[in-house]
Every structure is written in structure tokens, then in C-alpha cells.
């Protein structure tokens, strides 16, 4: 089954997955933003919504929205990786993603679901299981 998602739905899935997926770090995949990128994204969010409490994931999504990509690094493969909104929208339409998307949208998700969604956004498939 192919699921067609809006840009906002894709960003929400990525946000929720970032909140719940510590498993990528266990696979050697780490976020790789700079302090400057983080500070600029946080400043933009605080300017837009000064009364809103921010979490790390809000800022990471703002980096993705503002710069067009969220950088990662594969410490084992020594490779730069990234999520782009366009690539995530394309990859999340693959049949393999459907089960994980539905689990998250229905509240039946966990760290494994979140990791699978991020892997699909980055690699186009679940790599680490």
C-alpha cells in the first residue's frame, strides 16, 4: 500500500521519530549539525513563537526546514548522510514504509518504529532492522 503524505505530515513523522529513536545512535548514526546551525534555527523558532517551550527535536526540524537538510554521520561507514524533505517524501511513499507510518499515526509506535522511519528517510529502506 502506498501512502501519500503532505510535507507537514512528513515533518511530523520525522519529528516524532527523532523524539523516539535512540536506536540509530546504537547503529553508529549520529546527528551532525554545527553549533551555529543549531543556534540559528533556535533563534528563528524563538522569534516566531517566543512563548513556546522548545525541545531539541523542534530545533532539528527547523534546521531541516531552514537549510533543506538535516545532516547525519555514519561513524562505522565514515560517511556523511542527510535527510532532505524531498527525499523523505519520496522514500516514505515506498510500500516498506507503510506499516511503520500507520503504526506511528495510530499510536502503536516505539523506538523500533521511529528508527525504521528515519532509516527509510535516510537510506530509502530499513537497513539496521
Question: Model-derived features: where do they sit?
Answer:
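Exposed regions on extracellular, virion, or secretory-pathway luminal proteins
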Residues: 49-52, 93-97, 110, 123
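A structural signal for short, well-ordered beta-strand segments and their strand-loop junctions
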Residues: 71-72, 128
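Acidic, proline/glycine-rich low-complexity IDRs
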Residues: 103-128
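Motif-centric detector for short Cys/His coordination patterns
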Residues: 18, 23-29, 87-95, 100, ...
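Acidic, low-complexity, intrinsically disordered interaction modules
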Residues: 66, 72-103
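Long, contiguous N-terminal structural blocks used for assembly/anchoring
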Residues: 1-68
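Short amphipathic alpha-helical segments that mediate assembly, nucleic-acid/protein binding
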Residues: 7-11, 38, 56-57, 81, ...
